[in-house]
From Swiss-Prot:
The keyword 4Fe-4S does not apply. The gene is leuB. NCBIfam families: PRK03437.1. NAD(+) binds at G272, S273, A274, P275, D276, I277, A278, G279, Q280, G281, L282, A283, D284. Pathway: Amino-acid biosynthesis; L-leucine biosynthesis; L-leucine from 3-methyl-2-oxobutanoate: step 3/4. It comes from Parafrankia sp. (strain EAN1pec). The record marks Y128, K179 as: Important for catalysis. Belongs to the isocitrate and isopropylmalate dehydrogenases family. LeuB type 2 subfamily. PANTHER family: D-MALATE DEHYDROGENASE [DECARBOXYLATING] (PTHR43275:SF1). Homodimer. This is 3-isopropylmalate dehydrogenase. One of its GO terms (cellular component) is cytoplasm. It catalyses: (2R,3S)-3-isopropylmalate + NAD(+) = 4-methyl-2-oxopentanoate + CO2 + NADH. The lineage of its organism: Bacteria, Bacillati, Actinomycetota, Actinomycetes, Frankiales. Its cofactor is Mg(2+); Mn(2+). GO terms for biological process: L-leucine biosynthetic process.
């Protein structure tokens, strides 16, 4: 496996180091290349993602990212210049976010709800495509536009991915989330595409929720969801709700995928760089390790992925049974690597 590693800023390098230890515990043949990208590089050079680095990244099987950013970088610089550019250039059109409540993890929701869903979020279109502009900026007549771009090609490929994932799960249920009653043009495209592709997956049951209703049901009845497919912005919001109800953003893993394999997919914890605790051994690497499980699964190493996922579940349950005593980044990494190694 040829793996590009972007430790990034703050706690990013710390959690990535533990993720790599767990990866090597189950898959020793890993060749890594480290890339200095993020806030530190921007402060020193003004660069976010040089073309030469992007070209090198394309030569890897996958990318493991820690976290990027610090308060000194203006909003949007790293988001658009690095993270979104990687998504667009590497065609990461599927953003995959598991939403699972592990045994022993406390949810803020009452009643110990059963939560086990996957959100399949479109990753290269919608309002994040960068279309729009500003007129008469800084004047009382200022106009700002952000256009949501939805193509049949882009919608269909993410919908197909979602149906395929639903067909492999026991419940085989897919929910389209949109706002078809107001966003009638884009909503119609999404709804028709789901209906047409769904005809090819007769074993998958399908329903629809407006995004506002889905937001409520994520909190009041999350067990109703199995696989959710939605556009870029709605998915961005819903998945953070999903993280909040399953133990917090610190346990949330994600994958930015080109399922075709033409480009390396990227895997990362959802949390930020947390510069206030960097270097203190306080960061929990569990989300990074869960992202490593997704990486292995994506590259076809299902058995190794299951071992890492099992290690995450067992470690979280053991920590809960021990009363949730604080452990260092390294200690958690030790535990996860030992469990994964079997």
């Amino acid at each position: 496996m040829r793996l590009a590693v972007i430790g990034g800023d703050g706690i990013g390098p710390e959690v990535v180091a533990e993720g790599l230890r767990v990866l090597r515990a189950v898959h020793p043949k890993v060749e890594t290349t480290d890339y200095d990208l993020g806030a530190r590089r921007w402060h020193e050079t003004g660069e976010t993602l040089p073309d030469s680095v992007l070209a090198e990244l394309r030569g890897h099987d996958a990318i493991l990212l820690g976290a990027v950013g610090d308060p000194g970088v203006p909003s949007g610089v790293l988001e658009r210049g690095l993270l979104l550019r990687l998504r667009f250039e590497l065609d990461h059109h599927v953003n995959l976010r598991p939403v699972r409540l592990y045994p022993g993890v406390t949810s803020p929701l009452a009643g110990d709800p059963a939560i086990d869903m996957i959100v399949v979020r479109e990753g290269t279109e919608g309002p994040y495509a960068g279309a729009g502009g500003t007129l008469r900026r800084g004047t009382p007549q200022e106009v700002a536009t952000e256009e949501s771009l939805n193509t049949r090609f882009g919608v269909e490929r993410v919908v197909r991915d979602a149906f395929a994932r639903a067909s492999r799960r026991p419940r085989a249920h897919l929910t389209l989330v949109h706002k078809t009653n107001v966003l009638t043009k884009a909503g119609d495209l999404w709804a028709r595409t789901v209906a047409e592709v769904g005809a090819e997956f007769p074993a998958v049951s399908v329903d629809y929720q407006h995004v506002d209703a889905a937001s409520m049901f994520f909190v009041t009845d999350p067990a109703r969801f199995d696989v959710v497919v939605t556009d870029n912005m709605f998915g961005d919001i819903l998945t953070d709700i999903g993280a909040a109800i399953t133990g917090g953003i610190g346990l949330a893993a994600s994958g930015n995928l080109d399922p075709s394999g033409a480009n390396p997919s990227m895997f990362e914890p959802v949390h930020g760089s947390a510069p206030d605790i960097a270097g203190q051994g306080l960061a929990d690497p569990t989300a990074t390790v869960a992202s490593v499980a997704m990486l292995l699964d994506h590259l076809g190493h299902a058995d190794e992925a299951a071992r890492v996922e099992g290690a995450v579940a067992a470690s979280l349950a053991a920590r809960a049974a021990a009363g949730g005593a604080r452990r260092s980044t390294r200690e958690i990494g030790d535990d996860l690597a030992t469990r994964a190694a079997g």
